[in-house]
């Protein structure tokens, strides 16, 4: 799948991810000179003093949530604001509060992982992250971050998803009748058996598990588990289950973050559902295919998608 990564979220250097364990996050005392105001879910007011940052990682839970504790292997959805604190000056670098919530999955900056693991869903967390817990002495020139810059994060934790999260609705079909058959147990990757028949010429959307959640709308951040296979060979070429964490994207974004078949086939589906998408080349990777994934230009693709959440 096409993926758009937040450049400030992922450690682009070869630094280790030094995460805390379950329970309350371990860190030094919060920096009293950085203050955060405003309600959960709204863009925060952040005051950063006109002086140099301290050298240690400092974390403060500004708003205490009452939801589940975020575990080390969880993916989680949140809103964030990021400031670059450079010497005695600072500036807002990125914010999702004016756009869409983001799925935090995979490797985070070491300091951010230390700050967020062990927090409860519904919390607002302030993290002042020194270079050693961010991008190191090299910085991140592409993002305008120098090796001496401190990063200030404010993160609202909206929802967490365990690594084995799956569809939660009512089973209505296993496919078949000219379409692939799908079998699996709850919390496990679906198994796809492709028939020997020719694939459909047009996009097919088949609900396998009917969820009871809200319908997906264009522009939302959608969180899913998925398996993708090639019709011709039945070979699985991609799966979020193998990576051990769900996948998040903005549906019907411009430019698109996923293949057209996903944008077309998932809008209107209910959260909690498992949906099979049979995607012809025109709604997949087009005339160029995707050689890295072993997809030829004329290949029809089969996806089984578990819709875990949709967020505006």
What do the PLM-derived regions correspond to, one by one?
Residues 2-312:
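Cross-family detector of peptidyl-prolyl cis-trans isomerase
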């Amino acid at each position: 799948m096409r993926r758009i990564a937040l450049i400030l979220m992922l450690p682009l250097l070869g630094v280790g991810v030094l995460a805390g364990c379950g329970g309350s996050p371990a860190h030094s005392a919060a920096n009293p000179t950085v203050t955060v105001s405003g309600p959960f879910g709204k863009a925060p007011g952040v005051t950063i003093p006109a002086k140099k940052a301290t050298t240690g990682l400092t974390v403060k839970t500004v708003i205490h949530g009452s939801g589940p504790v975020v575990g080390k292997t969880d993916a989680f959805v949140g809103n964030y604001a990021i400031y670059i604190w450079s010497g005695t000056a600072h500036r807002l670098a990125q914010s999702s509060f004016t756009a869409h919530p983001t799925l935090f999955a995979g490797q985070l900056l070491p300091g951010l992982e230390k700050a967020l693991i062990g927090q409860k869903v519904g919390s607002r967390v302030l993290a002042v992250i020194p270079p050693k817990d961010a991008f190191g002495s090299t910085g991140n020139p592409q993002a305008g971050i120098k090796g001496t810059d401190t990063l200030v994060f404010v993160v609202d934790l909206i929802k967490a998803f365990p690594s084995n999260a799956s569809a939660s609705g009512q089973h209505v079909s296993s496919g078949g009748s000219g379409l692939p058959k799908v079998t699996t147990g709850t919390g496990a990757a679906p198994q796809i058996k492709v028939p020997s028949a020719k694939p459909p010429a047009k996009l097919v959307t088949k609900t396998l598990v009917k969820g009871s959640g809200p319908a997906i709308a264009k522009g939302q951040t959608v969180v899913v588990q998925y398996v993708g296979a090639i019709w011709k060979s039945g070979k699985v070429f991609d799966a979020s289950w193998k990576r051990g964490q769900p996948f998040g994207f903005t549906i019907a974004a411009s430019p698109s973050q996923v293949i057209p078949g996903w944008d077309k086939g998932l809008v209107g589906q209910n959260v909690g559902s498992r949906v099979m998408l049979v995607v012809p080349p025109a709604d997949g990777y087009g005339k160029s295919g995707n050689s890295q994934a072993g997809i030829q230009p004329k290949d029809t693709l089969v996806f089984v998608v578990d819709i875990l959440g949709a967020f505006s």
